[in-house]
Amino acid sequence: MRKMVAGLAVLGSVLTACATGDGGDRGDRGDGGAKPAGMSWAYDEILDEGSLSDVLVNGADDVWAVGTVPDSTDPSAGASPGEVSGASSSDGFLLHRDGTRWQRQPMPAVLGDSVHQARLDGLGSGGLLLTAAVQDTTTSRTAHWDGKEWAALPKLPDGGRVTEMKAFAADDIWVLATLSGFRHWDGTRWSAVALPDGVTVTTLDGVASDDLWAAGFRSTGDGTDGHEMQQPAAVHWDGKAWRQTDMPEYRFPDPVPAEPSASIARVLAVAADDIRAYGTHSFNHGEGVDEPEQEAVRLRWDGSRWSKVADAEGDCAGRVPEARDGDRGLFLDDDRYVTADGACTKIARPRLPDGDGVRADSRQVLRLSAREPVPGTGQVLGVGSVQVNQGGDQTTKAVVVSLKR
């Protein structure tokens, strides 16, 4: 951990490197794809170990990042996959940039000694929520930063791990969690959200406290009637009540494959009249002959109704957005990017500099866990890790990157 923290002195270049860059991007080896023109990631900081799981940008002078470093005293730390079962212990670390430099911040005591799957959610006015799971990842804990100090958010009534969160204020927080289900925090207590019969939601997003969407699927049968077992479903909060909205249905042509279903995995609120829903129409593969291709579920709310829309083209087809790039486009998985006019490209990945334990013949994989635009600047920051494989010697380094356009 001491080595990693020592590298923070040079992290002050994060918010300026986006515009300058060094033009030295060689891409990651073994990728097999042509290098795209226009955009690439550039390393702004390389930490000695661990990984960063999330970043929150309230402004150029208020940026947070959270990550973990495996506990070197834990017997499973450093073990090869399959050698030790179960989750290992991890030390969490928190970074904050005030516009001048990055500084290490102490983790809230409420999160305990071992931190997993940490996420950051903004509250406005400099406040934020930091949520992390315990070692076995079955339960989450949340801490609230009000700009001056940390305080524990009361535990969910039935426990469980937070899988989705949308927060508008310290007294207006919506979560989806295992065991506890769909809950709302009003500043005083957690209350359960009642959903229409048969509806299950798995994703949340919204543009305002009175304009929130939750989406997933509704159960429609057991499939024995030759129809889908699930269909896409979405409910909307207008500040007073939840209301289910009608969504188009998906059907496979005859002969219908085994156990067909369609559902939403991600809802993305671009504007009040532009809500995107992404999912899959699939089935139990291998149960029949001449099976159809599964298809992408792509739906859009225009302010009055949901309609089917075409999927992205080329290598962006079938991919789900992971972050917005303002009104320019969307970041997809595996560093694909689709522009506002539908063009698909791949963001080039840099290699780590040779030296400091990294060999020139190493194979490297950059994995970003979060990307976040810097408001009002056109800049984008990303955090994650780089896995370095070199002749059986494997290491992972936490990284901060910025987008070169």
Question: What residue spans do the PLM features occupy?
Answer:
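Secretory targeting and sorting signals
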Residues: 1-24
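Residue-level hotspots at or immediately adjacent to binding/recognition sites across diverse folds
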Residues: 19-405
